[in-house]
Amino acid sequence: MTDITTPFPATPHKLGLYPVVDSVEWIARLLDAGVTTLQLRIKDLPDEQVEDDIAAAIALGKRYDARLFINDYWQLAIKHGAYGVHLGQEDLDTTDLAAIHRAGLRLGVSTHDDSELARAIAVKPSYIALGHIFPTQTKDMPSAPQGLVELKRHIAGLSDYPTVAIGGISIDRVAAVLDCGVGSVAVVSAITQAPDWRAATAQLLQLIEGKE
């Protein structure tokens, strides 16, 4: 893991609603619906198969002046000038963090326990994601859910960092998550599997950011 001596560029302390989606189509829909922080997460495909989609998503993010993070594909994120990159713990050892830093991109890092939190803090990221908070079907997780007590404990020690809670957060759980002091709530199925994604997005924006 590359030693980083200066912090990655800052993001707002409260990133608000943070949908994580797997297609440019979802990026376009959510930007049009007023979302300003979001992540494109396409998994396990060669760079040449995803570059067009990543470039298109980044262009959309710039058009809407949004904070678009690219999951994993850091070289393409640098090439096309993304707002930021999001990495899992398993990516920290294999990614050229210094290259991301030199390019001026923001960095978000996933964490699941105290040891991973320490690793994340060591690279001085722009934000730290804490999860998974509740059981989730969206992604296979080797760790147990953190729950609200652990979330609150972790956030209490991260006052210098923007924080993002992720994992199994449905609309009816948002208020309890926010009460833990987190600055952002990441969602997947709460939007993508909602019977009416527009209504769900509007409700989440109102709950998390106070947007009508």
Curated annotation (Swiss-Prot):
CDD domains linked: TMP_TenI
Necessary cofactors: Mg(2+)
Transmembrane segments: none
Its EC number(s): 2.5.1.3
One GO term describing the cellular component: cytoplasm
Pathway recorded for this protein: Cofactor biosynthesis; thiamine diphosphate biosynthesis; thiamine phosphate from 4-amino-2-methyl-5-diphosphomethylpyrimidine and 4-methyl-5-(2-phosphoethyl)-thiazole: step 1/1
Molecular function as annotated in GO: magnesium ion binding; thiamine-phosphate diphosphorylase activity
Keywords noted in UniProt: Magnesium, Metal-binding, Thiamine biosynthesis, Transferase
UniProt binding sites for Mg(2+): D72, D91
Catalytic activity: 2-[(2R,5Z)-2-carboxy-4-methylthiazol-5(2H)-ylidene]ethyl phosphate + 4-amino-2-methyl-5-(diphosphooxymethyl)pyrimidine + 2 H(+) = thiamine phosphate + CO2 + diphosphate; 2-(2-carboxy-4-methylthiazol-5-yl)ethyl phosphate + 4-amino-2-methyl-5-(diphosphooxymethyl)pyrimidine + 2 H(+) = thiamine phosphate + CO2 + diphosphate; 4-methyl-5-(2-phosphooxyethyl)-thiazole + 4-amino-2-methyl-5-(diphosphooxymethyl)pyrimidine + H(+) = thiamine phosphate + diphosphate
Binding positions for 4-amino-2-methyl-5-(diphosphooxymethyl)pyrimidine per the UniProt entry: Q39, L40, R41, I42, K43, N71, S110, K139
Gene3D superfamilies xref list: Aldolase class I
Alphabetized PANTHER family for the sequence: THIAMINE-PHOSPHATE PYROPHOSPHORYLASE (PTHR20857), THIAMINE-PHOSPHATE SYNTHASE (PTHR20857:SF15)
Family: Belongs to the thiamine-phosphate synthase family.
Main function: Condenses 4-methyl-5-(beta-hydroxyethyl)thiazole monophosphate (THZ-P) and 2-methyl-4-amino-5-hydroxymethyl pyrimidine pyrophosphate (HMP-PP) to form thiamine monophosphate (TMP).
UniProt-recorded name of the protein: Thiamine-phosphate synthase
The organism of origin for this protein: Serratia proteamaculans (strain 568)
Source taxonomy: Bacteria, Pseudomonadati, Pseudomonadota, Gammaproteobacteria, Enterobacterales
Gene this protein is translated from: thiE
